[in-house]
Amino acid sequence: MVRRASSMGFESWWRRAESVGFCAHPIQLVGADEYRRDRVVWTRCNNRRAHICPSCSDLYARDTWQLVHAGAAGGHHGMPITVADRPQVFLTLTAPSYGAVHAATRGGDGKRGVCRDHHRIGGYRRCPHGKPLWCSTVHDHGEGRVGQPLCSECYDYVGHVLFTWHLPELWRRFTITLRRALHKELKATGVDPDGVRVSFIKIIELQVRAIPHIHALIRLDPHENGDDPDQTDWESPTSATKLAAIIEHAARTVTLALTDPTTDSAVRRIRFGTQIDTQPLTASSAPEKTGSAEQNSGIAGSLSGRRVARYLAKYVTKSLADLGISARRLSTEAIGDLDVSEHVRAILTTISALADKGLSGIKLRPGK
């Protein structure tokens, strides 16, 4: 290292690396200036994935924190400080259970617990394939078995893939359902529903069982007014607690009907899981509990805009690489050679099988 630092050209290299924030994959831009002289400029790759570029992903996470915090607490980036007084709810939407998986659990006292206590599941029961439905092991969070099915034959891989693929559409329908429910609630109380609008920011987090769930910050705003864009004197017609109740009801009622690809005529309904968490934010940062389990969102205790911003920024740099999957397209033939868990391999195999059935939108690159 000392030899390299004292070598010729090191200072020039250092200045170039420093100019792009020590990006792992800087991009060289070649062009001409206004006098038609050749010029070379280096710029960041701007990849948000931490495993590809730690520097750019860190910058992306910091930018995300700034944007979320500005929207939640105000006071910078053109957002008025009064935005913190508007009803805001931190929402977590999980996926349904498609089969029992190994888990790293903690009790109410914070101590680690056994994976699946036989007392909790009704004794030493086995699945139809003879696999035990209990697990007395205390798993660590980084352990390879965490997230793996207790019985891969029982696990509903088709449902897993369909939920993942149709999650964007399910979210879109949720936002429509929420706006309609809010419109109905405000109209019933004598408030003009056209005077408010709902703002969202969401990120996707991949659970250890390799299925996505959603974290979102939802805020109630006044409709834009050209004469007073900040509308600092606006008073919300409803509270954060009431907004949280409307959000939870919308999330529990929205569904998406699909033709089951495993049968000729059956219909499969895609919906969010039962673990839906809504946590209102208040200007005083004191949490208003709505009955949902706080641990579902990963944020316990006092909830503020700063904490929500930090939590969302933490996950925007994650990617499929955490499961051992490259961001590049895969061929069906390559699935068997991937260095991934059997659970992930089964998911990819299911995607391939559904693609062969001609399921809309799901495709794999054909082998060469």
Q: Where are the regions that the model predicts?
A:
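Signature for HUH/AEP ssDNA processing cores
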Residues: 77-202, 206
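Helical (often loop-to-helix) elements that flank the catalytic cores of nucleotide-handling enzymes
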Residues: 217-266
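Histidine-centered divalent-metal-coordination microenvironment in nucleic-acid enzymes
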Residues: 53, 91, 192-227, 312
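Acidic/histidine-rich catalytic neighborhood
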Residues: 212-217, 254-298
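Long, low-complexity, charged/polar intrinsically disordered accessory regions
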Residues: 1-61, 70, 274-368
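Generic recognition of stable, solvent-exposed alpha-helical segments in well-folded globular domains
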Residues: 48-51, 165-169, 173, 238, ...
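Short cysteine/histidine-rich metal-coordination sites, predominantly Zn2+-binding motifs
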Residues: 68-79
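Short helix/loop capping segments that flank catalytic or ligand/cofactor-binding pockets
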Residues: 61-65, 99-104, 225-228, 320-321
